[in-house]
């Protein structure tokens, strides 16, 4: 199976090919999909829909912390580059109360500075992370176990 299929099977979004995935009762999972088709909202609207209690200042600060400028923040998500769209999705994820993150290629489309900021944020994360990534230089020093799904091996 593919990596995205594996993650979606774990989450129960699609049925497992065999066996079953059973999640614990106290999991609060945040999921970062590799590709998502953006809607018509601006970045501000995207975050406000997710966090309606935030003030405009808090929404703008959260988006800025993810590397988006005022120009980006006021633009529709669909006109942004792939990296900028990913930053909006990451903004939602890091501001959600979770104890498990499932990340499907979160570094795709990100520039070096954004990758560094993401790695810093993930290193401070207190929960568990299941990360699909093809960039050893990104996950090196961040992860405790590496699973090679193509060879079905666990690397230490």
List PLM regions with ranges:
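ABC ATP-binding cassette signature C-motif
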Residues: 1-156
């Amino acid at each position: 199976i593919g990596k995205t299929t594996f993650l979606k099977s774990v989450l129960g979004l699609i049925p497992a090919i065999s066996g079953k995935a059973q999640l614990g009762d106290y999991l609060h999972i945040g999921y970062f999909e590799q590709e998502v088709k953006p809607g018509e909202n601006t970045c501000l609207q995207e975050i406000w829909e997710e966090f309606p209690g935030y003030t405009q200042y808090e929404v703008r600060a959260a988006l800025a912390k993810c590397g988006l400028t005022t120009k980006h923040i006021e633009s529709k998500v669909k006109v942004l580059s792939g990296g900028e769209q990913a930053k909006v999705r990451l903004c939602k994820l890091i501001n959600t109360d979770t104890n498990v993150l499932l990340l499907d290629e979160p570094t795709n489309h990100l520039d070096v500075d954004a990758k560094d900021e993401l790695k810093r944020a993930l290193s401070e994360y207190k929960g568990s992370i299941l990360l699909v990534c093809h960039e050893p230089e990104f996950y090196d020093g961040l992860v405790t176990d590496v699973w090679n799904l193509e060879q079905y091996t666990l690397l230490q």
